[in-house]
Amino acid sequence: MEEEFPTISLLGIDFNLSNILMITVTCVIVLLIAIICTRNLQRRPTGKQNFIEWVMDFVRGIINSNMDWKTGGRFHVLGITILMFVFVANMLGLPLQIAVNDEVWWRSPTADPIVTLTLAIMVLGLTHYYGIKMRGFKHYFVGTYLSPMKFLFPLKLVEEFANTLTLGLRLYGNIFAGEVLLTIIATQLAHINIFVGVLAIIPAIIWQAFSLFIGAIQAYIFTMLTMVYMSHKVSDEH
């Protein structure tokens, strides 16, 4: 199933307008959630404040499972941002896809490998940055690439490439597969009679719920692996 997307060319480079739109929408939604949930904070949290505090505690638990809080506390906001961004991005294409003139405008941005691999590269780039910043270049390089044995250096380089590739493609594969199946189900529903269609709605709803679960799990996995890779770079014991 080949899809077409609106593009714009700038300086000889083609940009996917659908990705730009959906990433912007994702950022706006995450920003609104943060603003709404942190407005009028109370000593006894209720409702939306309970939700944002649960998210904060959840990410704190992820960090604490990989490194001590003294080291990992500075990545708390990063973890919250990644978790919420990836989750919202995963959800956008679940209820509907919008196409205009056979060009898809509305779908999950994480259903595009360019988006997920870019996220992975940014995350791995941050791990290297903080590793050098917190440990110094020499200590970081020796501890990361020459420990425990120097001859493992080529394998360590392969590992860096593999980590980046799998972090991005895992997220892409799960979200893309979910959207493809939902599209197939919706297409089949449009070509059958109303009585069979009513019955066919049931598996569609079940798959929607399953895709919601998968989207949440993938957001958790992406955040968890971010902190795992970060701990490998900034913690001496790794």
Swiss-Prot record:
Protein name in the entry: ATP synthase subunit a
Record-annotated disulphide pairs: none
Gene assigned in the entry: atpB
Membrane topology: Multi-pass membrane protein
Recorded GO CC terms: plasma membrane; proton-transporting ATP synthase complex
Primary location: membrane
Subcellular location: Cell membrane
GO BP terms in the entry: proton motive force-driven plasma membrane ATP synthesis
Keyword Cell membrane: yes
SUPFAM superfamilies: F1F0 ATP synthase subunit A (SSF81336)
Gene3D superfamilies referenced in this protein's UniProt entry, alphabetically: ATP synthase, F0 complex, subunit A
Residues that span the membrane, as ranges: 17-37, 75-95, 112-132, 172-192, 194-214
Family the UniProt entry places it in: Belongs to the ATPase A chain family.
Single Gene Ontology MF annotation: proton-transporting ATP synthase activity, rotational mechanism
Keyword tags: ATP synthesis, Cell membrane, CF(0), Hydrogen ion transport, Ion transport, Membrane, Transmembrane, Transmembrane helix, Transport
General function of this protein: Key component of the proton channel; it plays a direct role in the translocation of protons across the membrane.
CDD domains linked: ATP-synt_Fo_a_6
Keyword Zinc-finger found: no
Subunit structure: F-type ATPases have 2 components, CF(1) - the catalytic core - and CF(0) - the membrane proton channel. CF(1) has five subunits: alpha(3), beta(3), gamma(1), delta(1), epsilon(1). CF(0) has three main subunits: a(1), b(2) and c(9-12). The alpha and beta chains form an alternating ring which encloses part of the gamma chain. CF(1) is attached to CF(0) by a central stalk formed by the gamma and epsilon chains, while a peripheral stalk is formed by the delta and b chains.
